[in-house]
């Protein structure tokens, strides 16, 4: 694959996180293109159940291969800013599925590019498998250099799915710019409220049990405000009115990290685990 190359600077819209959601400030750009994620949307509807993936079905689907070819040929900088964010989230999730299938992995994504018990230098997230607009990216490039650096949008962490049971569930539809705000809010609520093994609030003990996504992985905590209290305030908006929301908003709690399950998020593994 071709090495990652730097793009020439291009005026980009500014994506700001407003309390109520995604705020887009338009830049003086030329006429904007569109990218149809309908193929990926149909595949997600067909082959994702309760956030779990039928990897064999994606591997066997010629439509998926055709969708990846379209990603590889398309220049996303021609899109509006909200469409760019949706495009890159969909690209990340699609190429994660492709990475797993390219290596015929069915146990854990962490087994990819691993030998003698150690992940080799580039690991699964740095393999230049994801081609967009003629440039090869690693999944890390998409997450760290494009989505996180260019967009002040913490909710992307609820949408990017790294092929593990411990991740937020893979959404059964593609992300699209004109519904992105609502989709990200819904993902946040699903991850926070419907996965007690990952996130839950213990009112009596004044303890918030949180996924490592919030408090351990990389420097993600800074995306949510930089402290455990700030994380609580951020996620409180996704809770219904009541004692849990009040405790989170107060910042007067202690945090305990929940275990992170790196088992592949496949439907077959979910059945074996009785999920």
Where are these regions (language model features)?
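Bacterial N-terminal signal peptides that target proteins for export
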Residues: 2-15
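Interaction/scaffold regions that mediate signaling and macromolecular assembly across diverse proteins
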Residues: 32-275
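Sec/Tat signal peptide C-region and signal peptidase I cleavage site
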Residues: 25-31
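Bacterial N-terminal signal peptides
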Residues: 12-24
């Amino acid at each position: 694959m071709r090495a990652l190359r730097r793009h020439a600077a291009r005026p980009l819209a500014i994506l700001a996180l407003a309390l109520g959601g995604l705020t887009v400030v338009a830049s003086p750009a030329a006429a904007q293109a569109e990218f149809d994620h309908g193929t990926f949307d149909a595949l997600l509807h067909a082959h994702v159940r309760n956030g779990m993936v039928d990897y064999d079905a994606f591997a066997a689907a010629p439509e998926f291969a055709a969708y990846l070819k379209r990603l590889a040929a398309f220049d996303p900088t021609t899109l509006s800013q909200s469409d760019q964010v949706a495009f890159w989230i969909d690209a990340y999730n699609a190429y994660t599925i492709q990475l797993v299938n390219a290596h015929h992995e069915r146990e854990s994504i962490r087994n990819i590019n691993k030998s003698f018990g150690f992940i080799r230098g580039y690991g699964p997230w740095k393999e230049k498998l994801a081609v967009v607009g003629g440039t090869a990216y690693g999944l890390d490039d998409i997450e760290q250099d494009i989505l996180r650096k260019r967009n002040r949008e913490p909710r992307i962490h609820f949408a990017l799915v790294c092929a593990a049971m411990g991740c937020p569930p893979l959404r059964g539809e593609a992300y699209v710019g004109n519904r992105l705000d609502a989709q990200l809010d819904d993902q946040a609520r699903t991850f926070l409220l419907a996965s007690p093994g990952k996130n839950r609030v213990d009112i009596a003990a004044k303890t918030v049990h949180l996924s490592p996504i919030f408090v351990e992985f990389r420097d993600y905590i800074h995306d949510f405000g930089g402290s455990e209290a700030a994380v609580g305030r951020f996620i409180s908006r996704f809770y219904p009115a009541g004692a849990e929301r009040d405790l989170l908003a107060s910042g007067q709690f202690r945090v305990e990290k929940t275990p992170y399950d790196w088992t592949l998020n496949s439907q077959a593994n979910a059945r074996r685990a009785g999920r």
